[in-house]
Amino acid sequence: MSKRLQVVLNQDVRKLGNNGDLVEVAPGYARNYLLPQGIASLATPGILRQVEQRREKERQRLLAELQDAEARKVALKTVGKLIIRKQVGEENQIFGTVTTQDVADAIKERAGQDVDRRGITLPEIGKTGSYEAQVKLHPEVTATVQFDVIPL
């Protein structure tokens, strides 16, 4: 079997790896394509240290995001019930619907936190009453927010 070269990718390469990955490739592929195009660099001890430092920074950033999301979850728990006002008709049927934007606005007003409306999951809401919404703050952190729908 022929000798393989270790290179560190400087950008994503389809079917080979992502930016910063250490991969083994055929010497001709590295010498004739990856290195001249600037797509990869030879894996020297200095470059390997740089790659490891980048990975550590990325890991620290992801950990900080997770801790921030956990703190926001605790803050949302302490807020209490949110209030959403809607126009109602007979038998407390609401006109229109309660949207995720309504819940996001209520969270912003009450807790002072910006929440992406696309991360909010609502139950079917047809009448006034108490409901719960799931708010996805991070891929690993979901908070539950209670709210009341009351007449305008």
UniProtKB/Swiss-Prot annotation:
Domain of life: Bacteria
PROSITE patterns, alphabetized: RIBOSOMAL_L9 (PS00651)
Gene Ontology CC terms, in alphabetical order: ribonucleoprotein complex; ribosome
GO biological process: translation
Any one GO MF annotation of this record: structural constituent of ribosome
One Pfam family recorded for the sequence: Ribosomal_L9_N
Protein keywords: Ribonucleoprotein, Ribosomal protein, RNA-binding, rRNA-binding
Gene3D superfamilies, per the entry: Ribosomal protein L9, C-terminal domain, Ribosomal protein L9, N-terminal domain
InterPro entries for this protein: Ribosomal_bL9 (IPR000244), Ribosomal_bL9/RNase_H1_N (IPR009027), Ribosomal_bL9_bac/chp (IPR020594), Ribosomal_bL9_C (IPR020069), Ribosomal_bL9_C_sf (IPR036791), Ribosomal_bL9_N (IPR020070), Ribosomal_bL9_N_sf (IPR036935)
Family matches, as SUPFAM superfamilies: L9 N-domain-like (SSF55658), Ribosomal protein L9 C-domain (SSF55653)
Family, similarity comment: Belongs to the bacterial ribosomal protein bL9 family.
Family matches, as NCBIfam families: L9
Role of this protein: Binds to the 23S rRNA.
Xref: HAMAP family: Ribosomal_bL9
Name assigned to this protein: Large ribosomal subunit protein bL9
Gene this protein is translated from: rplI
